Amino acid sequence: MKKHFLNSTLMQGLSLGLLFLFASVTAYAQRYSYESIPNDPMQTRIYTLKNGLKIYLSVNKEKPRVQTYIAVRTGSRNDPKETTGLAHYLEHLMFKGTTHFGSSNVEAERPYLDSIEARFEQYRHITDPAARKQWYHQIDSISQLAARYNIPNEYDKMMTAIGSEGTNAYTSNDVTCYVENIPSNEIDTWARVQGDRFQNMVIRGFHTELEAVYEEYNIGLSSDWRKVYAALFAKLFPTHPYGTQTTIGLGEHLKNPSITNIKNYFNKYYVPNNIAICLSGDLDPDKTVASIEKYFGNWKPSAHIDVPQFPAQPALTAPVDTTVVGKEAPMLFMGWRADASKSLQLDTLEVIAQLLSNGQAGLFDLDLSQKLKVQEVSAGIADMDEYSVFYVYGQPKSGQTLQEVRSLALSEIEKLKKGNFSDDLLPSIVNNYKRYYYTQLDNNQFRAKQYVD
C-alpha cells in the first residue's frame, strides 16, 4: 500500500511537471503575437514590441546565415535647413561607438567631446576667415586629445569577429538603413551590439569623419549625372526637400556642422517606434524576437514624432527645361512627378517603364536602341514616401542633339498611350516580374530588403 502511494505521488508529480513544462513551452511560443499576410510566399511574421519597435522576420534555411537591416524612418528629407547633409553624416557617425565600446576611457574622453561640440557651435557662426582658421586649430588640438581614448574601427572589428559580412549603411530621402549579414548562431550577439549602438551612440572623430563626407561631396561635384539629377528634382519639387536639398548636403553646411543639431536629430528620429528591424535567413522566430526584445525592449519610445510637413507641390502645367553645364558626354533627363511609392499608380508606372525599356522588347529597345537611332535611352522610377518620379534617360549619338533624342523618346511614349505595341508585350512583362520575384526568394538580401522598401 505504501509502495502504491509513493508511485501515485511520483506519477502525480510527473504529470504536474509535464503539464507545467507544456504550459511553459506554450506560453513561450505564444509570448510574441505577430501579424502575417495571406498567401505570402516568404511567410513573413510582423511583430510589434511594446515600445513600438517593428520586427519583420522571414525564415529561409538555404544557408546558415541571416541578412539584417535596421531601418530608421528618416532621411535627408528631415535634414534641418541650416545643416543639410545631417542624416547622411549621422549615418557615418553611427560606426564610431557607444558608451560601451569605441573608447578606452569614456569618462576621461567626455569633457573633450563636450568641448568639441561647444566649439563647433561657435565656429559655425564665425565668418572671418582668419578667426575661423584659428578657432578650427583649437578644435583640432582638442580633438587630438580626445583621440587618445579613441579605439578606431572597433565596431567593424566586433562585426568581423562574429563572422559578419557586408557591414554597410545608406541614407536616402526617407530612410537611413544599417546592414549586416551574420551567421545564424550570432543573432543574440548582433542584437546586443545593435541595441547598444542605437541607444548609447557617442559622436567621436567628428571633424576627421567630416573630411570623409566632404570628399564624397567633392566627388559628387565632378559627376554630371548627379548634377542633372539634382536639377531635375529641383524643378519637380520646388518647395519640398526632395528638390530643395540633396542627401549629401550643401558644401556651406558641411563646412559649418553642428554636433548639437545631429544629437537633436538622433534623439528625435532614432526612437523604437520609428524603426523596423528586418531579418531573413536561418532563424528561429521566437528566439530571435526574444533576443531583440532583451536588448531593445527597454528602449523608451517617443510620445510624438514631429515630422516636418510640407505643402502640396504646385501643379506642373507646362514643360520646364533646364540646362546643366558639365564636362561629360551630353545626356537627357525627362521627369514626371507622380504619387507616393505606396500608391497603386507606382505599380502602373513600373509596368509602363518596362513597356518602354526592358533591354529587349520595349518600345525604346525595338524602335530606338536596336535601330541605332540614339546612343542610349531608358525609362525608370524613383520612388519616395511622398512622391515618385517617372523618368526617361537618354544619350545622343554622334552629331545628334538632345532635342532630337527628346523628340524620339516622346514619340515612343505617344505610341504607348495609343496602345501601339505588340499584344504579347504586356503579358510577357507581367510574367517576367513574377519570374524575377520567385527566383529571388532564395536570396535573403532580396527578402529582407522588401520589408525596408
Describe each model-derived feature in a short phrase.
Residues 30-31, 197, 201-205, 218-222, ...:
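An aromatic/glycine/proline-enriched structural segment found at the starts
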Residues 32-74:
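Mature N-terminal segment immediately following signal peptide/propeptide cleavage
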Residues 58, 63-76, 85-87, 103-196, ...:
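M16 family metallopeptidases and their MPP-like homologs
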Residues 84-96:
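Active-site recognition of the HExxH zinc-binding catalytic motif
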